[in-house]
């Protein structure tokens, strides 16, 4: 087993829906990783939400045993990676643990924006790349055209591309032969001292934290005392093994292998991804380079609809955090919504998935406030702040300048939808950086404010291109911007949960839209309700919900006018008292609808 020349570590990279997980299923089936009765679609996507949405969120690993045509038995370690931009960090971790990649491209759709990002990441990691063209059995498949597109855009040789249909299993043996013959084995171990890369970790209710590692030098065996170099914490290894994708316990993991171990670690936070693991008695001299830390870019408030559920929400977030170290949260309170948490996410899909997991796995009913990003505030007294909650924004008089984050977005779109996509980017304050054509598809690169993206950009991009546009982005720079805090007042009371930070040019439009929406959502009361949008002390939009009026004269048939006047005066005095002391109850349904992402 310690013949490293018979090991191949590879990851599968592709855009969403191009067939990564299906190809992984076929490879597992072909190599007998699971018996036929144990196979299911997307066998590596363990969460229900992954299967339903057809996306991969957590990278998974499998060891396959393959008897090649040259008569040798090879051990193939497959890392299935996510395709969505929010989980690019998961991709970078998987790539760092491998020497080669299978680049899967849908032969009916060609190169998409995320394909490019993942390929460039693989090239940065010095990966050997095997090109696989999938969905060959579909009538719309155009392999030759897609090959030309790949050569033009990415610049890799397509003459030895493997043509397959992962769904029907055509060409799977060719993929396995290409892995064995074209991808390099791990580098020879230069030392007997343990040096391993911590690729991922997750929480298992029975075993504690399970750690996925790639052994670079030496070996990892049961009962060894190991040290994490970033935290200097020492643990005793309890179990060592690998996935096929079922868990298999083994005695030892040799150099070049990818596997897991458990060591009675209580929290995932104690295991920093990208850390170097070494032997406590004979530590290695130098740590591995590791990864860039993953910082949240989108923030929003999560509140339980019923305040008695707060403790349940707190426990649920702590459990999710055990498996997802990139997700952050802290407690906050709102006068309108009560006590909840301010949470940080990698992007909107990440936000949606955490929300959905909370409602499904923990049966929670939540209100989500409008998403926001991190702003840099420069105060007149020289202090610099970073805020992501509109409620924390200081008084505008004390602020010297504000900076907002901008992103660099790559959009691939068929040319017939180009006009609609360009006008959407312009509407979102975008600046065009580049524009090129590949066959009948346009590739545009835009600089866009992240603040505009987190609302409804992705949905609107998909609808204006009938679902054909693909979009990928990375953080670019912070730039000064004319930002203001848009406040919403109901009967002169500020509703903090509806406050947002917007660009001054969009404030009036967004304020008016929110007022109109709230007017439809808040039920009529016995008095007039004023809904106002404000910037500081200036009101920029107003809507009024007219009062319900009880007919107090309904029982007066004729009779003296003074009797009627007395009843009307009594009603008037009652309404005046209500205006003075009455609190307007905004129903939860109104909050939820008003906070729906995007402007209708």
Swiss-Prot record:
Any one GO BP annotation for this protein: positive regulation of translation
Species per Swiss-Prot/TrEMBL record: Rickettsia peacockii (strain Rustic)
Residue ranges of domain tr-type G in the record: 5-187
RNA-binding among keywords: no
Predominant location: membrane
GO cellular component: plasma membrane
InterPro entries the record matches: EF-4, EFG_III/V, EFG_V-like, EFTu-like_2, G_TR_CS, LepA_C_sf, LepA_CTD, LepA_IV
Official protein name in the record: Elongation factor 4
Family annotation (PANTHER family): TRANSLATION FACTOR GUF1 HOMOLOG, CHLOROPLASTIC (PTHR43512:SF4), TRANSLATION FACTOR GUF1-RELATED (PTHR43512)
